C-alpha cells in the first residue's frame, strides 16, 4: 500500500507546444474572431496527441492543455468585464478579479477535455469505417463514428450541464453560426 510511485513520462515540449497552439487556434474560431473554418481542422491534433502517447497521464494532461488554451482564447471577453466599478471593485483589484474569473472558468471548462481524453483513450478504436476484430479478439469500433458521438455526449452535454456548473459559451457548434448551409446539412 505504501509502495506508490508517481507515473513517469518523458516531457516532450513539442507536444505541449502543439497542444497549446492548436487549442489557441481552435479558440480563434469563436464568435468575435470569425475564423470559423479553423474549427474544422484545429481539433485533429487533439485526437492525434491522445493516440500518439502511451501514457494515460500524458494523454489527459495534453488534452487539458489543449482545452485550457481553447477556453482561454474563446473566453477572452471575460477580460472586458473589468473595471468592475459597477460591483464596487475599483482599479487594479477589479482587473484582478476579472482575470481570476477568466482563468478559473477556463480551467473548469478544460476539465471536460480531460474527461473526454480519459474516456476516449481507453476505447478500442480502429481507423476503418466498420467494426472489426482486433488483436486479443477485441472488437475495434470505427473512430469516425465513436469520436463525434463521444464529443457530443461528454464535452457538449456533460461538460456544459448547468447542474455541474458548466457554461455553454464554448460549445463547438457556436463557431459555425454564420454558416447556415453547413448547419442545415447536419
Question: Can you annotate each of these PLM segments?
Answer:
Residues 1-186:
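Membrane-embedded alpha-helical bundles of multi-pass enzymes
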